Amino acid sequence: MRKTPSHTEKKMVYSIRSLKNGTGSVLIGASLVLLAMATPTISSDESTPTTNEPNNRNTTTLAQPLTDTAAGSGKNESDISSPGNANASLEKTEEKPAASPADPAPQTGQDRSSEPTTSTSPVTTETKAEEPIEDNYFRIHVKKLPEENKDAQGLWTWDDVEKPSENWPNGALSFKDAKKDDYGYYLDVKLKGEQAKKISFLINNTAGKNLTGDKSVEKLVPKMNEAWLDQDYKVFSYEPQPAGTVRVNYYRTDGNYDKKSLWYWGDVKNPSSAQWPDGTDFTATGKYGRYIDIPLNEAAREFGFLLLDESKQGDDVKIRKENYKFTDLKNHSQIFLKDDDESIYTNPYYVHDIRMTGAQHVGTSSIESSFSTLVGAKKEDILKHSNITNHLGNKVTITDVAIDEAGKKVTYSGDFSDTKHPYTVSYNSDQFTTKTSWRLKDETYSYDGKLGADLKEEGKQVDLTLWSPSADKVSVVVYDKNDPDKVVGTVALEKGERGTWKQTLDSTNKLGITDFTGYYYQYQIERQGKTVLALDPYAKSLAAWNSDDSKIDDAHKVAKAAFVDPAKLGPQDLTYGKIHNFKTREDAVIYEAHVRDFTSDPAIAKDLTKPFGTFEAFIEKLDYLKDLGVTHIQLLPVLSYYFVNELKNHERLSDYASSNSNYNWGYDPQNYFSLTGMYSSDPKNPEKRIAEFKNLINEIHKRGMGAILDVVYNHTAKVDLFEDLEPNYYHFMDADGTPRTSFGGGRLGTTHHMTKRLLIDSIKYLVDTYKVDGFRFDMMGDHDAASIEEAYKAARALNPNLIMLGEGWRTYAGDENMPTKAADQDWMKHTDTVAVFSDDIRNNLKSGYPNEGQPAFITGGKRDVNTIFKNLIAQPTNFEADSPGDVIQYIAAHDNLTLFDIIAQSIKKDPSKAENYAEIHRRLRLGNLMVLTAQGTPFIHSGQEYGRTKQFRDPAYKTPVAEDKVPNKSHLLRDKDGNPFDYPYFIHDSYDSSDAVNKFDWTKATDGKAYPENVKSRDYMKGLIALRQSTDAFRLKSLQDIKDRVHLITVPGQNGVEKEDVVIGYQITAPNGDIYAVFVNADEKAREFNLGTAFAHLRNAEVLADENQAGPVGIANPKGLEWTEKGLKLNALTATVLRVSQNGTSHESTAEEKPDSTPSKPEHQNEASHPAHQDPAPEARPDSTKPDAKVADAENKPSQATADSQAEQPAQEAQASSVKEAVRNESVENSSKENIPATPDKQAELPNTGIKNENKLLFAGISLLALLGLGFLLKNKKEN
């Protein structure tokens, strides 16, 4: 059945409609069309219609990364430039619009539109009526809401508000109730009282998206009661001005503005140029006195000015003799001047710049105070206006001060040896009581002895050590092994050296316990009259944890630790792994998997002998990963995490849900030594999880693979987890000594000695106890580089084959005003130990934060060819990598949409349609090929190999639903016509979703009859991994080696390759002399690659990858490519890998093209079953001596095996030169998960890409039609 007109048909219709002159015109038009058909194309098949026109319509809202980033990744923390708003002791004058300026005769060529706002008489600006702000309320103005439907958006508030928002996301203050003025919407928030200083907020929607990132505003003065968000959601204490304008406000206490003016210069459109001193008058009246609006140049940064009183003469005309200079036009659109004050203020409250903002006791001879700014500060002035007293009120002599202008801090020197009591520091009117800094505790209490609970003597004795230097008393509360809620007894610990507390539990403690194994405990800490129950940070196992009980009482707020001896549990033959095909980090192929996801598919329930979702069940499916060929399995966090009920881990989550699920990725850590009970067959048994995890690692090692643990040291689930142990120490700190937070937990301060020690001790324990083979650091850029490097060295001392990688986003916050080198992407040029993920290759190949879902290289978006090439050779453009092993090459991970889903979103094609489903898989295979043939270390997300999706296939969500019903963390996907997909919701961050969303779909991964495309993609990746491991060509070990051995073929500007394009080709010479070439055509039409003379030797190559399969052996009848006179032509959405062996012959046997419908049956294979050792098959290679020799014949006759398979699956392997032709004959999954029969088009009906020789008849026909048409026209003319 015909669906769309062909290119030829379109031309005929155009001819008919254009000529409109009777039958003769029609005939002439037809002859023109036939003439066009006879004209050959040159470098690409232009006659093939493009099926996916560019469409820039954005139909989705991107989630905030947790990366981004992030991205990556986490929430944005935005610092206010000038918090708050206007309401000082100034007269409250309603703003009215300035009167039109009296226009003098314009000067020739002068742009009057860029003149400052002024007038000849005082006027007021006018705004739409705005309700007065009630006492104890704070008004937040929003220029523009992030989304159109204001009723589905709200203001989520916390900190010094009367009632912090609860019940995410619906507990926010709804914009449904917002008022509107000339600026935009506004909401009033009630504060918790006069002491309120900080208001924090964000705008979210009912789907649970944080649309703006976290924002906060500090009240500069008590009467400050409003703030504004601009269009980018930056917070200001004044109403932001339109872009390209700065408003200069001038307030005079005497109210006399007569002849007061401004003379200005710098980055302004029209600097003052009249006769001196005729400046621009202050005539417009606003909230803060008089003002002048000055148009700015593009990208303006600074401008200078003078305040003038034109009633005076000579130099006295200057109100201040010195020039004013403002250098922050990038961040401020209003400035505030007062009388003859020398300061330029960026807030309407005239708060002096140099203000103390906090004080910390940092050492026995030093106190450090933070300041709003120290620009221009003089040592003698700081000394003169500073004062320090001890807790008795006695003045302490300041012997010296050191000013750190960049860090905005002053260090006072003196005798501050009293470490038990705070000091009071004042500067002018600002006064702060010191907080004990972590630096003072490091100097006084840092400890390197043993910590935690050591079970000894067959369980008869426990040695306890806790570090808590500020505690007044510490006891251990022991709970019954069979009932963790039952207290057996309490034993006091004794104060030890350097802030430690110690005790030995045995038969003398009168607890009545002869064997402490399996009993539980918590620490009870008393400090300054307050008592807390805390979890031992060095606990080796825990009681079954249920976060739902955390609000019952303090005993349930954190988990209870267990007394265990891990050395005696699990397989005693566990040792470090001997990983196949792995010597250096460039050899690794990392596969990321979630323990529960991997076996939660009900389809394999009957095959499992162990409970699904557990370490034990994971073992039963390990052979799949061995068969795939990966070297390392990276497990999402397996250490104890907070928000989960482990007691219900056995319950299946079969219904579709993306919130309120008993499921977690594990990025909310509770402990860094104990495993979670979620993946244990018995969470109530604290020993079993240890034994079972050891067994999993052992089985991974037996199969020649390694295990990498995903660890989350950058933040905790709750700040109190460590603040209760020792306040103001374990976390990075603000300048005033309060802990910094992230995602609701604390940012662990790894520059602090005991925190760094916790991280390194944890890493060493996990390596030594579980024999793991690597670590992936979540948000590694949050850490200092020194700590990560030290952890790496400690781990490698135990396991020399261990590898480390992490998210190197530039997110380091650290301690305020204490910068240090971060463990981020910028660190890569200084280290060859730890690798980072490359967001550059991810974003360029398939899109990512902040433009996820936009077309990229494999989804139809042209990209800079040189940028793509640099990424493929492990030289990303956004950071410097001095070694290929520094770079983790990836296009999918657990965050955001899966690769399959992001492709569907980007190309706007509904996968429920067979041809779309096939096209998505073709693009997916392109991406996988590019990652697995790239230099560096490839990384695969579980299911990426078969096209995993997280589509929300609940029948109630088959079509779009009301906004308040939209699934949490979902994108609604539409096609390019704006029509929603069938089941249009796709979950992008599924950390709170059910098994129905998250499961690894084993049927898709392995059943080739039911899901031929999925299994083809899976087998394609398996072949790519085998190909990668068969040669050093894709695993070069140095940057110099890459420069010498890898060369770009598709040079932009040559042979039809554009600067930005969707094709790439390059050559690699392996260390053994073999030559490999990779060509990728991500275009929607066939493309030809000109080899020229420099790469003519590639005509002798064997094909290792085509559009259907890949591997280390040559393909007998490769599909999707053909040799041409100029070089190589690839079909649309096709890639290939070629090899020219050193001796000019094939390495191994040539593989026959196999039918797509052959089901994949992964088995536990030994080396003998590796494809490289298959029996030789007849080699069929193109004759490269003939210019028109084809690798894939244009007629594309199927092999016998293919022909045999077409009884079940018609029209297999049709060669295509356009996207539609490439995918029209595939069998794919429809919305009911049933197999859709292939489109019954015959291969013979596909258009020919070559030029036939029957053109003589065609030209004869053209001539006849033209003569007939001319006859009709002459007859018509004669009749008229």
UniProtKB/Swiss-Prot annotation:
The keyword Transferase does not apply. The record marks D895 as: Transition state stabilizer. Its EC number is 3.2.1.41. The keyword Cell cycle does not apply. Inhibited by 4-O-alpha-D-glucopyranosylmoranoline (G1M). Pfam families: Alpha-amylase, CBM_48, Gram_pos_anchor, PUD, SpuA_C, YSIRK_signal. This protein may have potential in the disruption of glycogen adherence of the pneumococci to the host cell or disruption of glycogen breakdown in the host cells by the bacteria and thus could be useful in treating streptococcal lung infections. Residues 1-44 form the signal peptide. Its main location: secreted. Residues 42-132, 1140-1248 are annotated as: Disordered. The modification Pentaglycyl murein peptidoglycan amidated threonine is found at T1249. Substrate binds at residues 156-158, 168, 214, 263-265, 276, 318, 323, 667-668, 743, 809, 839, 842, 849, 896, 969, 989-991. Ca(2+) 1 binds at S661, Y663, D992. Residues 1250-1280 form a propeptide. GO terms for molecular function: amylopectin binding; calcium ion binding; glycogen binding; limit dextrinase activity; polysaccharide binding; pullulan binding; pullulanase activity. A motif (LPXTG sorting signal) lies at residues 1246-1250. PROSITE patterns: GRAM_POS_ANCHORING (PS50847). Ca(2+) 2 binds at M828, T831, D832, D882, D886. It is a peptidoglycan-anchor. Keywords: Calcium, Cell wall, Glycosidase, Hydrolase, Metal-binding, Peptidoglycan-anchor, Secreted, Signal, Virulence. It is an enzyme of class 3 (hydrolase). GO terms for biological process: alpha-glucan biosynthetic process. Virulence factor. Involved in the degradation of glycogen of the mammalian host cells. Hydrolyzes the alpha-1,6-branchpoints of glycogen. Hydrolyzes pullulan. Does not hydrolyze dextran. Binds to mouse lung alveolar type II cells that are rich in glycogen stores. The N-terminal tandem family 41 carbohydrate-binding modules (CBM) are involved in carbohydrate binding. The C-terminal glycosyl hydrolase 13 (GH13) domain is involved in catalysis. Belongs to the glycosyl hydrolase 13 family. This is Pullulanase A. It comes from Streptococcus pneumoniae serotype 4 (strain ATCC BAA-334 / TIGR4). The lineage of its organism: Bacteria, Bacillati, Bacillota, Bacilli, Lactobacillales.
